[in-house]
């Protein structure tokens, strides 16, 4: 259900404005890029939106490849030239083409179910062997669920970082390696301390609000992404 509401939710959280009828030359150009890349990928043209934020960022979301949304921030359009913006749009369109939103939701759902079942089973086993009673069982269950959830998060975040490399590569193949590298280089130094996206949407943006190089990061470092792209050229 959350996937089917994801476009509406994203627009609500960011205040994005859908560009159904372009009013400016910039909007016409943006829509033409999205339409061209959708045709190359072989899926229906996503909704295109612009949201107001001084931070350069963009995101993609949607329940399926043919029911998707690609949005860019006003800060990104002000900071980047057209080649760099095209690289960013190519990255987001790659997420749509690769079905990353659906895969992430499925992985999260399966792991959540796995964590619940295993935590209950192990909690019951421990409470019976140690004669902890009903209260002891629930304490074990809660502690185990928290522990297993943290471990499962490492798996989800690892996949999130891998999909960023894949989206970078997809953009490089469709719009050019140089454009994608140039876009990432611009993202090294955001122009505002404001978080690029609401915290709940960090994993959907092209960059994370707090650049980290750890197992808890949703995105790889900009440097490692650029290095991976340079290996393609």
Language-model regions: role of each:
Residues 7, 34, 72, 87-95, ...:
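Active-site recognition of the HExxH zinc-binding catalytic motif
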Residues 93-109, 180:
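Catalytic Zn2+-binding segment of zinc metalloproteases
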Residues 67-69, 85:
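Conserved catalytic motifs of the protein kinase core domain
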Residues 19-22, 74-87:
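Short pre-active-site segment immediately N-terminal to the catalytic Zn-binding motif
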Residues 79, 96-100, 132-140:
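Juxtamembrane/transmembrane-helix boundary motifs in multi-pass membrane proteins
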Residues 1-61, 108, 112-165, 190-195, ...:
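Hydrophobic or amphipathic, alpha-helical segments that drive membrane association/targeting
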Residues 42-67, 154, 158, 171-233:
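Active-site-proximal gating segments in proteases and membrane effectors
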Residues 29, 84, 105, 162, ...:
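Alpha-helix N-cap and coil->helix boundary residues
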């Amino acid at each position: 259900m959350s996937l089917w509401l994801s476009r509406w939710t994203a627009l609500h959280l960011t205040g994005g404005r859908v560009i159904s009828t372009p009013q400016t030359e910039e909007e016409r150009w943006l829509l033409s890029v999205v339409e061209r890349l959708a045709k190359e990928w072989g899926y229906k043209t996503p909704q295109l939106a612009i949201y107001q934020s001084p931070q350069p960022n963009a995101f993609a979301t949607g329940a399926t490849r043919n029911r998707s949304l690609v949005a860019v921030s006003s800060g990104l359009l002000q900071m980047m030239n057209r080649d760099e913006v095209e690289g960013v749009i190519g990255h987001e369109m790659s997420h749509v083409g690769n079905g990353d939103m659906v895969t992430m939701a499925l992985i999260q759902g399966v792991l959540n179910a796995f964590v619940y079942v295993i935590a209950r089973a192990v909690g019951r086993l421990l409470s019976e062997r140690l004669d902890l009673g009903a209260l002891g069982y629930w304490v074990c269950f809660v502690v185990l669920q928290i522990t297993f959830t943290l471990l499962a998060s490492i798996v989800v975040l690892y996949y999130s970082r891998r999909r960023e490399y894949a989206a970078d590569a997809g953009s490089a193949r469709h719009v050019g390696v140089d454009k994608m590298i140039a876009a990432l280089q611009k993202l090294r130094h955001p122009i505002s301390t404001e978080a690029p996206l609401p915290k709940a949407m960090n994993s959907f943006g092209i960059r994370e609000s707090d650049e980290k190089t750890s197992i808890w990061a949703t995105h790889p470092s900009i440097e490692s992404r650029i290095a991976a792209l340079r290996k393609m050229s």
